[in-house]
Amino acid sequence: MSNEENKVTEEELDQIIAEAEKVEEAELNEESVDEQEAKIAQLEAALLSSESKVKEQQDSVLRAKAEVENMRRRSEQEIDKARKFALNKFAEGLLPVIDNLERAMQAADAENEVVKPLFEGVELTHKTFVDTVAKFGLKEINPEGEVFNPEFHQAMSIQESPDHESNTVMFVMQKGYELNGRVVRPAMVMVAK
């Protein structure tokens, strides 16, 4: 072999080696790209997982806030209700006192000069007492002439009456009372048939 042939062969050999190195480098780059793509896919999956966890946590926080708000509102309503109706049993206990004062005024002879000062004292006591309990929300239910309503009235008897429309209250036997819109005692009434 001559030097020229050797040169060509060496040049070819150098070229082959250079091409082999390029191929090897390209394969390394492909492996590196594959590894990077795998890492990117892993990171994207982790990101999606983190985002879904964040959404779940945000939903949990919103639900917790709503629950706390509902509890606060319920508590306020219960406190308001308790405040309004705390006097219910006390009011029930006072009703016989009002009834007895009214009976005393009905039984007394207001024209009798001996009884008149006593009658006026009972009348004044009754008025003061009724005014005082009214300040705390206790109101009288006196439905004479109204249409019978079982929520506010208790029918003690039903009678025919040409002077009254059917199903109206003819006579109140005992006044009823309500406390802040809630019936403490229904009015005992006689209803027209």
From Swiss-Prot:
It comes from the Bacteria. GO terms for biological process: protein folding. CDD domains: GrpE. Pfam families: GrpE. The keyword Cytoplasm applies. Gene3D superfamilies: 3.90.20.20, Head domain of nucleotide exchange factor GrpE. The keyword Lyase does not apply. HAMAP family: GrpE (MF_01151). NCBIfam families: PRK14139.1, PRK14140.1, PRK14150.1. Participates actively in the response to hyperosmotic and heat shock by preventing the aggregation of stress-denatured proteins, in association with DnaK and GrpE. It is the nucleotide exchange factor for DnaK and may function as a thermosensor. Unfolded proteins bind initially to DnaJ; upon interaction with the DnaJ-bound protein, DnaK hydrolyzes its bound ATP, resulting in the formation of a stable complex. GrpE releases ADP from DnaK; ATP binding to DnaK triggers the release of the substrate protein, thus completing the reaction cycle. Belongs to the GrpE family. This is Protein GrpE. It comes from Vibrio atlanticus (strain LGP32) (Vibrio splendidus (strain Mel32)). The gene is grpE.
